[in-house]
Amino acid sequence: MLTNLRIFAMSHQTIPSVYINNICCYKIRASLKRLKPHVPLGRNCSSLPGLIGNDIKSLHSIINPPIAKIRNIGIMAHIDAGKTTTTERILYYSGYTRSLGDVDDGDTVTDFMAQERERGITIQSAAVTFDWKGYRVNLIDTPGHVDFTLEVERCLRVLDGAVAVFDASAGVEAQTLTVWRQADKHNIPRICFLNKMDKTGASFKYAVESIREKLKAKPLLLQLPIGEAKTFKGVVDVVMKEKLLWNCNSNDGKDFERKPLLEMNDPELLKETTEARNALIEQVADLDDEFADLVLEEFSENFDLLPAEKLQTAIHRVTLAQTAVPVLCGSALKNKGIQPLLDAVTMYLPSPEERNYEFLQWYKDDLCALAFKVLHDKQRGPLVFMRIYSGTIKPQLAIHNINGNCTERISRLLLPFADQHVEIPSLTAGNIALTVGLKHTATGDTIVSSKSSALAAARRAEREGEKKHRQNNEAERLLLAGVEIPEPVFFCTIEPPSLSKQPDLEHALKCLQREDPSLKVRLDPDSGQTVLCGMGELHIEIIHDRIKREYGLETYLGPLQVAYRETILNSVRATDTLDRTLGDKRHLVTVEVEARPIETSSVMPVIEFEYAESINEGLLKVSQEAIENGIHSACLQGPLLGSPIQDVAITLHSLTIHPGTSTTMISACVSRCVQKALKKADKQVLEPLMNLEVTVARDYLSPVLADLAQRRGNIQEIQTRQDNKVVIGFVPLAEIMGYSTVLRTLTSGSATFALELSTYQAMNPQDQNTLLNRRSGLT
């Protein structure tokens, strides 16, 4: 039934690409069921940006385009490679902003938090939805700072493709390697954009070679630059054999002309492009059998006759297979090369239906979605970003959370436009939605339509497992792979201005933890103080700043400290008995455990549980959860520093439980026995060891190396990058605190560095004793 749908926007707000007056109303004929009377939208909500303007489309085609026309992509790179600037240009050329946002001016759309705009870095990934030439693009702008790798991980989990942005003068940098590995883990097809081609020192050849050498990827050169550094003025489309030149008189880069390369006008450029195109055809033919057969059968004599469409289709297949990566170039800041990049996104990156998600066979057409991000809004409460893999989401829909085993109701459904949110009637598979009303859903939770739907999918998965003779529990595979949360490496105490503000602080921290699972909060059992644990100095600083800005609390941070770990060096046994009478009930437990060291390569705390054959299976069945809770509790705080225990195996050798003994008493006895064993053993402090990469001018190399030697640094190699030297090595985290200030002083502000957690290593006895004495107040 055709109906008139009114879209209201209240409260006189400015939205990129549109200016909404106090009340603006558009009538749109849409083939939809009649909707209930709707309350006008509040602050930061609007009608769809695409609906306001001259081009008014049908509501359904705007909200739910064909799945083949959807692209869920992310932008990933090293810090300062130009991710946010590239995103702002994409939004501008797609028509969703009317002016060019600039990181340096602090007026970008995707960097919508105050700290992001002030610091010129991206912290939280803003999801942006826009259209480009008939395609719906859901774009995630991700951070490049090492303190915020969880944001990258969280977003990569739900992407179908990605754009890797590189600084053309630096090539592949430290954080690029980290993000590239994360994308490999999720099998995400990528295209590369060599940004900053206008920058002094930019080198297309060097950047391409670094992709080949450092990322072990096969670059497909789809473009060549016309000039470099100050002479950069455009790009050559290798596939089409055309040159793209931007109008020098145009400040916004919208005006550019595409001209075919002709022998009379550009003989040298035509020759170079022809050679590049022939090399591209040969490279793609080596990677794609279907294309190789086509070339050999019809175009082996003359590659010039090969239609561009055939080559583009083959490049699309190769990109999806991840056997090579298309490479484009430009300058986002100078507004060159962004429109061809958008064309490449729609042409070469996959649609949701081209991605092979095995779990979809179990859900059929039922709802299956992943909650990949949670934000907290003061007016609307928790906002949950979801990637919809199958089915449809609507407002007032009851959904089942498999992880939490609970049912909740979506009150409102929004389409994200940075910090502007558009209310919509439904979203289908392939889209990214923003939901309101889910108070118990957390990052990484799997969402389905109902508990019965989950059970039906579990039965299908189980049958599939039996066919393939799988040993693992197939029902567990219904849970979509969640976000791997890294362990924090720094911690500090945080105190409110007064005891009366403690509940407010706890509320603020609870909200921030829902948004950022890499932020850990714990209570120190000795001092009773609240302890913040984070991924780095900047991470802790940002959290402190947000508590002040968003919750109005002037908190006080204690000194920043390194998060050490502890382990043991030898095997020990311990026995403990707990005998208590509460009321008229006696609780009696006797436990014997053995603790021994194990070797692992994980940076996550590893504790293994084992049970001796002599343990009564019936007794173990009713008490296993209590036993393992007790072991886990004992390993949270080691005997030396109170740091977590890792790389230890605990074996339960004997267990005697008096009838009627509570599980709480069992846990308490096991915990006390394990702690006794850990205290008896020879103990070792483990410190976080960081991968370090310092990029420094040749003139300042010597003082930087001398300083790193004093910091117990272990230099692995020194590379040459253009006119700079790149120092690569390892350094203990404790020695690198405040290093940015020192490095600026040593190099007159010309050097940069990147850190990433490598592993935990044993401290030498002298450093360990110094640390223990300092913590105990003896020094």
UniProtKB/Swiss-Prot annotation:
GO cellular component terms, semicolon-separated: mitochondrial matrix; mitochondrion
Tissue specificity comment: Widely expressed.
Protein's cellular compartments: Mitochondrion
Disorder cited: Combined oxidative phosphorylation deficiency 39: An autosomal recessive disorder due to mitochondrial dysfunction and characterized by global developmental delay, axial hypotonia, dystonia, dysarthria, impaired intellectual development with poor speech, and deficiencies of the mitochondrial respiratory chain enzyme complexes. Neuroimaging shows abnormalities in the putamen and caudate nuclei, along with subcortical white matter involvement.
BP-aspect Gene Ontology terms: mitochondrial translation; mitochondrial translational termination; ribosome disassembly
UniProt binding sites for GTP: 77-84, 141-145, 195-198
Catalysed reaction equations from the record: GTP + H2O = GDP + phosphate + H(+)
InterPro entries cross-referenced by the UniProt entry: EF-G-like_DII, EFG2, EFG_II, EFG_III, EFG_III/V, EFG_V, EFG_V-like, G_TR_CS
UniProt keyword terms in alphabetical order: Disease variant, GTP-binding, Hydrolase, Mitochondrion, Nucleotide-binding, Primary mitochondrial disease, Protein biosynthesis
Organism: Homo sapiens
Originating gene: GFM2
Record flagged with keyword Mitochondrion: yes
Name the record gives this protein: Ribosome-releasing factor 2, mitochondrial
Ion transport found in the keyword field: no
GO molecular function, one term: GTPase activity
Domain tr-type G span(s) in chain numbering: 68-353
